Amino acid sequence: MFKDFFNRTKKKKYLTVQDSKNKDVPAGIMTKCPKCKKIMYTKELAENLNVCFNCDHHIALTAYKRIEAISDEGSFTEFDKGMTSANPLDFPSYLEKIEKDQQKTGLKEAVVTGTAQLDGMKFGVAVMDSRFRMGSMGSVIGEKICRIIDYCTENRLPFILFSASGGARMQEGIISLMQMGKTSVSLKRHSDAGLLYISYLTHPTTGGVSASFASVGDINLSEPKALIGFAGRRVIEQTINEKLPDDFQTAEFLLEHGQLDKVVHRNDMRQTLSEILKIHQEVTK
């Protein structure tokens, strides 16, 4: 009797709960902040221009959402929408990666260009989208940017460029690097014509883009906490054998050291650009 009592196994008393993860929540209805991890309604976040309600982190905007935020409704006309990259160096798997990003983003390349109006003032615009090849600069990006700059020069329009890039596109080699000089020459012609160029640096702006067209605006603006620099932090520290400040390569650090004119919160982006365009319009009358 006692032997049977001690050998008796206890019945487990628990309930099995079925995993219902995401079953009742439509895809895309919620977004998690990449910084503080707070989960928010995607629609409400979009209404706040993708700025986190909890930590104020500026989550990336798509190129078209950025243009929508700074332009009058229905005023944007896109240029060169169908232009796509070739594979000049026959780099393995390059075209496959391009096609994958095209399907993922709905873009042909990592920059959208065209003209728009802000409070009735016409301007040329280029917006880089870091979802596509991390916004890396290849031949198509250089060509599209040069074309819109040249259009602005010919039609005497101010030009606004939003940069977001990991640098030059390695799969295009020297062809990618030459876009640094090519875009700078177009901007020089625009400047010589007495026209305004506003460079708006967003997170991240690095490498060849930061060393060329992103840094030569008549007015250089940035979003808060944006990473802006040329080489990586670790590379610099190993080269100079020194420890860099914690806020090195942030927008605030560059503002403090005179490399930016202003750090602008995204909710103030439209108003700030409108005020600058109005000043330029008055001066050039």
From Swiss-Prot:
Reaction it catalyzes: N(6)-carboxybiotinyl-L-lysyl-[protein] + acetyl-CoA = N(6)-biotinyl-L-lysyl-[protein] + malonyl-CoA
Binding of Zn(2+), residues: C33, C36, C52, C55
Record keywords: ATP-binding, Cytoplasm, Fatty acid biosynthesis, Fatty acid metabolism, Lipid biosynthesis, Lipid metabolism, Metal-binding, Nucleotide-binding, Transferase, Zinc, Zinc-finger
Gene3D superfamilies xrefs: 2-enoyl-CoA Hydratase, Chain A, domain 1 (3.90.226.10)
Ranges annotated as C4-type zinc finger: 33-55
Statement: the UniProt record of this protein carries the keyword Nucleus: no
Chain ranges of the CoA carboxyltransferase N-terminal domain: 29-285
Cofactors required: Zn(2+)
One Pfam family hit: Zn_ribbon_ACC
Subcellular localization: Cytoplasm
UniProt-recorded Gene Ontology molecular function terms: acetyl-CoA carboxylase activity; ATP binding; carboxyl- or carbamoyltransferase activity; zinc ion binding
Comment on bound cofactor: Binds 1 zinc ion per subunit.
Ranges in a coiled coil: none
Pathway assigned to this chain's UniProt record: Lipid metabolism; malonyl-CoA biosynthesis; malonyl-CoA from acetyl-CoA: step 1/1
GO cellular component: acetyl-CoA carboxylase complex
EC number: 2.1.3.15
Oligomer and partners: Acetyl-CoA carboxylase is a heterohexamer composed of biotin carboxyl carrier protein (AccB), biotin carboxylase (AccC) and two subunits each of ACCase subunit alpha (AccA) and ACCase subunit beta (AccD).
Family: Belongs to the AccD/PCCB family.
Protein name: Acetyl-coenzyme A carboxylase carboxyl transferase subunit beta
Record organism: Staphylococcus aureus (strain Newman)
Name of the gene encoding the protein in the UniProt record: accD
